[in-house]
Amino acid sequence: MSRQFPHSSAPLRSVKEVQFGLLSPEEVRAISVAKIEYPETMDQATKRPREGGLNDPRLGSIDRNFKCQTCGEDMAECPGHFGHIELAKPVFHIGFIAKIKKVCECVCMHCGKLLLDESNPAMAQAIRIRDPKKRFNAVWNLCKGKMICEADVLQDDGEGNEPKRTSRGGCGHTQPVVRKDGLKLWGTWKQNKNYDETEQPERRLLTPSEILNVFKHINSEDCVRLGFNEDYARPEWMLITVLPVPPPPVRPSIAFNDTARGEDDLTFKLADVIKANINVQRLELDGSPQHVISEFEALLQFHVATYMDNDIAGQPQALQKTGRPIKSIRARLKGKEGRLRGNLMGKRVDFSARTVISGDPNLDLDQVGVPISIARTLTYPEIVTPYNIHRLTEYVRNGPNEHPGAKYVIRDTGDRIDLRYNKRAGDIALQYGWKVERHLMDDDPVLFNRQPSLHKMSMMCHRVKVMPYSTFRLNLSVTSPYNADFDGDEMNLHVPQSPETRAELSEICAVPLQIVSPQSNKPVMGIVQDTLCGVRKMTLRDIFIEYDQVMNMLYWIPDWDGVIPPMNLKDLNNVKQMVVSGSKGSFINISQMSACVGQQIVEGKRIPFGFADRSLPHFTKDDYSPESKGFVENSYLRGLTPQEFFFHAMAGREGLIDTAVKTAETGYIQRRLVKALEDIMVHYDGTTRNSLGDIIQFVYGEDGVDGTQVESQSVDVIPGTDESFERRYRVDLLDPEKCIRDSLLESGKEVRGDVNLQRVLDEEYEQLCNDRRYLREVCFTNGDYTWPLPVNLRRIIQNAQQLFHGGRHKASDLRLEEIVEGVKELCKKLLVLRGDSPLVKESQENATLLFQCLVRSRLATRRVIEEFRLNRMSFEWAMGEIETQFQKSLVHPGEMVGVIAAQSIGEPATQMTLNTFHYAGVSSKNVTLGVPRLKEILNVAKNIKTPALTVYLEKDIAADIEKAKVVQSAIEHTTLKNVTASTEIFYDPDPRSTVLEEDYDTVEAYFAIPDEKVEESIEKQSPWLLRLELDRAKMLDKQLTMAQVAEKISQNFGEDLFVIWSDDTADKLIIRCRVVRDPKSLDEDVDAEEDQILKRIEAHMLESISLRGIQGITRVFMMQHKLSLPDETGEFKQGQEWVLETDGVNLADVMAVPGVDAKRTYSNNFIEILSVLGIEATRSALFKEILNVIAFDGSYVNYRHMALLVDVMTARGHLMAITRHGINRADTGALMRCSFEETVEILLEAGAAAELDDCHGISENVVLGQLAPLGTGAFDVMVDDKILQSSPSNMSVPVGAAEGAGAYADDGGATPYREYDMEDDKIQFEEGAGFSPIHTAPVSDGAGALTAYGGQPGSPSPTSPFAYGATSPAYGGASPGYGVTSPTYSPTSPSYSPTSPSYSPTSPSYSPTSPSYSPTSPSYSPTSPSYSPTSPSYSPTSPSYSPTSPSYSPTSPSYSPTSPSYSPTSPSYSPTSPSYSPTSPSYSPTSPSYSPTSPSYSPTSPLYSPTSPSYSPTSPSYSPTSPSYSPTSPSYSPTSPQYSPTSPAYSPTSPQYSPNSPQYSPRSPLYSPDQNDDKDKKQ
């Protein structure tokens, strides 16, 4: 902090936990410094704040001329002090009024005792609940029905004796029913049961004073049972007796002139409270009648309530004089602009800039062009050290207006010198330890951002490049992650203000490190637009370019071609070129421009008829012709007619509206996702947990791998026939046909017939068969065999073949059992979780299972020898490489995977169209998709728009459409209404005959055969007839017969209805029903009502008679689904099966239908799945649904993100919606919940329940402004005091010597890319070898000048084998790369000024010919000596460079480029020193005496000279993990003779020296010395 605060005796600590509670009246009085009694703020006589008024001077100063009377500080420093108002009568706190009512229902309103106690078993259960809020609700639910406070209870002793009476100390009074009305509570006392019902119950007001009195009597035990807290939140504190008055800084007033002040809303409101309070006091003293007093009490209650909350339902809002509602305290806190979300969770910050962006193809991917005006405004505080004092002095001299300058100097006392007003700025002598706020310079890391920030690639770290003019410039390829274009977009830039932040930005957030996105494990940046189009043109098969033309490509472009154009668009057509190369546009754009715009669609249909059956007035009625319904036949080129234009505008308008609505919807979805998952992090034990420590996943993503490190790979054991599988993997040494060819193996002859070896190979083959079976039956049942897995095996094998290509044509020296053993060992080494407990072992096995199958299938014995032809060296190298890469691809502890998952799901949602119109499928079966469906899933909606089942059938039925139809009709729910065409009621008095001609035959036929029962009932039959006519088509469709329908009707009504039905073959399908009357009630007047009865029967019949099928299934469609199953040869074949899809769901009943495959049947309503199949099935269903939504429009999101989301939603055993009803019902801290929604309610609830927030979450720490425990803050750093004491102090170096090093030493660059000054033309590259971006050789330095990360051992560094003299052509002063005009050696750079005293060209240590200081030396990166981008050991993916590795912490003393012992120019480090001659005897690499802990190694010790014989870089103990390892040490420099890549000692073919050989595992405990001996012997 640069500002100095006045001295305070309070110790400074970070907040560890927050205790919520209610203030008791005693506390309020104790906190208060003034009792406020007057509503005025100013004393009119003295024109000063009035004592005892609302702006009492003791509360804090409001005027910069006066000091605060309490603390004596001025306006800027005084934090303000609380006052208090003594209320004449207690009032309810508006936030707690509902809680007060509930407590009234729990305790006796007479004696304050809880109405139930442990003697009630349900109550005993409720009291045991630990969470106070839940406990209170449980107790309230039991007590609210209890209407009497019992004096003694009957207790049953359980042995059948008389129940005993035990006293519980109640008072025996009846309890009132409490009702809330506005701001009042009313109690209604019901009289005892034995009184008359007519008697009016007593109803009266429960005054706050009365309730306060009752609450004071609640004893501490009951207090805890009710979920309160004796110390922090007693129930009576929910009523306000003393109102705290916030200090003026909370409610500042504006001075218009000396007299008038504009007061804040809260001040107005407090004045109203005081006025009302004075009125009540006055009336009390005057002894006014009660009804008058209660009027004024209600007014006081109203003012206190609206002061806190002015949006009370059913209450008039308190208004200001202008008629604007007053802004209450609650309104200040809640909502997006409120205190929490607006000022605590997110604030406006300093050191930021915003301007328009434009593109610049000449910038690096990770650079950003910053206007000079911004660079002069933004600063970075740099601490003065011996290494930068010259440079900083130069900046201070330049002052604030000249670009490489400075704005402020801050002394160690904290005083700030403003250089704008300091006339003698040039004379300020900087001291070590001061700070200089210097301008933004080239290569400073900055955070660059474009809103909306939908994923983490919307904020990335760029390197500054200061440029003229006023816009930010950025490389074209970086626009896609920002979703930016140059049509006027603006972007924000933030400057980090501490070395830690800079380090974190440049090592974690740098653009090159974000190229591969974890969202869908693919690059998010690529070549776009012009570049893409140009690249395609240059690389067409028929375009040939001369070498010199390529060299000068920037100056002219070849126009050679010799191709006859085809009939379609010429390849030279500019539009077509853009489409084909993919830089802009699509096929449809071309068609619409040149051929025809096509049909316009609104809401998924053609243009609708707007009025009077036409779409526009000049069409005729019912015109369905194309032009009337919106078909545009013209192209944009020909132009649209007016009506076409109008229809086109309609469709376009819909798109715009859709986009606007969608943006708001998806923005809210994204916010909810982030809030639900924000605290989920990978911990150091490999588990994924939230801030409470609940385990969400045992292993992140179920495999523990980082989403950016996986690639789609095919597991080769899954596809293919059994025969081809055997051919590919089985080795039979006893059968010459199936044995490996002799010519491929050195031991080819010996292995023939080796039974023991055959046993090993059989075991391997058996394992492969098991893999194949398991993967086919469990994992990939549909025969799909690609899956995102870590470590690209194909690439590793290819690199192995190329690096060790000598062995490709010779027989391999591998032994077969070595391969099997090697693969087994490798599988054991793939550790995701470490530990021995059974649980850990199981998780470990599950996590690596798929990858093990992949490794076993790729590195099977037969394939290694026959297909890949690896020899021992290349095989061992590959094994080591796989292990290293696998360890590298594991997820880092501290990674905030929750937020990544939320962004990965929210971002595609933004791209989704809102209403995805129903896809044209079978008879309009529609499914909700897109954003509306995503909303349903995340809200866990009870009633979804389109519930549907997918009913799979048993094998034999699924193949046969006829059998499937039987099941279909059995499932589809059919009511009588579905098949009825019409119903009629007739008066047809004779039951044996009929007045209807067409029914005559039916009736005759029925009565032709006499039946006793029928004869009996004829007498009782009603003359009214209900006649149903059924629809024959529907009956046939549903396969129903008349008899079945009639039987269902009879079943329903039994003997009371007489039913006659026509034959199935009759002309019309008729059912005749008559009511059978009870002979007892054969009165005449019944006849009159009978037709009414019949009408009711008719309605009931149609609605409720279910003919067949399952309730809830309205329709069933038959669909053919593709199915791939292995046939008898073992190959997956595509087949078809019939599947039923339904509208409506009823999973439990459908599963029970015979013929349905219950195992596969699926419902898209996962709430139903939860009730039928349980939570684990729900998790899969939920995953499937989210996947469907995302995959529908062709997006792909990696499995792990969706898995994490569904795991969070189901982790507690019930479905947690991603809404306030789900997220905010979790037991996370109150601060975290209130930062989402319902801010004030949650804080009030937290106060009443006296919650404790332990600040483990993200939001809590953001609110408190602390470092949250995530990412680099997830661990603590242990400081080694011993090393600290022995470390060199900054001041111990002569300034001159240090200055050379300090040239640019203070800060590393941000990215591993850079331009190279020189290249050796003698280098030959093999095709493709080692140029993969991930391939590393950790020791060879300077390798791979053409790739980002490192290359192969045949290192193209500009070196010659032994000649290291100063005359070496690569370093001579005459070397073209080293002119004084060379750009890296700019004479204007301040520290290079030839007049600088430390730069004596004659100084032996600073000879420009010193090889280590040539600007072309890879270790001399212009930004810092320690930052050689070409060094593979600096590769961001290099194992030894793990940002978590303690020895490589950029702040560790041994790494600090500012540490004196690392200055490459320090005299003792001169590589030209004679003892560095490689032939010098003292330079023995095997010298045993070199131990980094030996006293002679203390960097400050006088004995420590690199010339000391014991200092050998190749000495075994000089391991890269040793604390002394620094890439800048000259012994690691590519110019060191020991590292000459061409030196025979560095033979890439020497197996022991392979940098990635298994012995060189970066985690291997020692870099074993005997390797070096072997090497010497070999030479």
Curated annotation (Swiss-Prot):
Q: Which InterPro entries does the record associate with it?
A: DNA-dir_RpoC_beta_prime, RNA_pol_asu, RNA_pol_II_repeat_euk, RNA_pol_N, RNA_pol_Rpb1_1, RNA_pol_Rpb1_3, RNA_pol_Rpb1_4, RNA_pol_Rpb1_5
Positions contributing to Zn(2+) 2 binding: C108, C111, C149, C171
Binding-site list for Mg(2+) 2: D485, D487
Keyword Signal included in the entry's annotation: no
> Which subcellular locations apply to this protein?
Nucleus
MF terms in GO: DNA binding; DNA-directed RNA polymerase activity; metal ion binding
Find the cross-link Glycyl lysine isopeptide (Lys-Gly) (interchain with G-Cter in ubiquitin): K1080
Q: Which Pfam families match?
A: RNA_pol_Rpb1_1, RNA_pol_Rpb1_2, RNA_pol_Rpb1_3, RNA_pol_Rpb1_4, RNA_pol_Rpb1_5, RNA_pol_Rpb1_6, RNA_pol_Rpb1_7, RNA_pol_Rpb1_R
Q: Where does Mg(2+) 1 bind?
A: D485, D487, D489
- Name the GO terms of the biological process aspect: transcription by RNA polymerase II
Q: Which SUPFAM superfamilies match?
A: beta and beta-prime subunits of DNA dependent RNA-polymerase
Return the GO cellular component terms, semicolon-separated: mitochondrion; RNA polymerase II, core complex
Ranges occupied by sequence repeats:
1385-1391, 1392-1398, 1399-1405, 1406-1412, 1413-1419, 1420-1426, 1427-1433, 1434-1440, 1441-1447, 1448-1454, 1455-1461, 1462-1468, 1469-1475, 1476-1482, 1483-1489, 1490-1496, 1497-1503, 1504-1510, 1511-1517, 1518-1524, 1525-1531, 1532-1538, 1539-1545, 1546-1552, 1553-1559, 1560-1566
**Quick one: where's region Disordered?**
1382-1579
Q: Which reaction does it catalyse?
A: RNA(n) + a ribonucleoside 5'-triphosphate = RNA(n+1) + diphosphate
For binding Zn(2+) 1, which residues are annotated in this chain's numbering? C68, C71, C78, H81
- SMART domains (alphabetical): RPOLA_N
The UniProt PTM text for this protein says:
The tandem 7 residues repeats in the C-terminal domain (CTD) can be highly phosphorylated. The phosphorylation activates Pol II. Phosphorylation occurs mainly at residues 'Ser-2' and 'Ser-5' of the heptapeptide repeat. The phosphorylation state is believed to result from the balanced action of site-specific CTD kinases and phosphatase, and a 'CTD code' that specifies the position of Pol II within the transcription cycle has been proposed. Following transcription stress, the elongating form of RNA polymerase II (RNA pol IIo) is polyubiquitinated via 'Lys-63'-linkages on Lys-1080 at DNA damage sites without leading to degradation: ubiquitination promotes RNA pol IIo backtracking to allow access by the transcription-coupled nucleotide excision repair (TC-NER) machinery.
Notes concerning its domains: The C-terminal domain (CTD) serves as a platform for assembly of factors that regulate transcription initiation, elongation, termination and mRNA processing.
Would you tell me the protein name for this molecule? DNA-directed RNA polymerase II subunit RPB1
- The species this protein was found in: Meyerozyma guilliermondii (strain ATCC 6260 / CBS 566 / DSM 6381 / JCM 1539 / NBRC 10279 / NRRL Y-324) (Yeast)
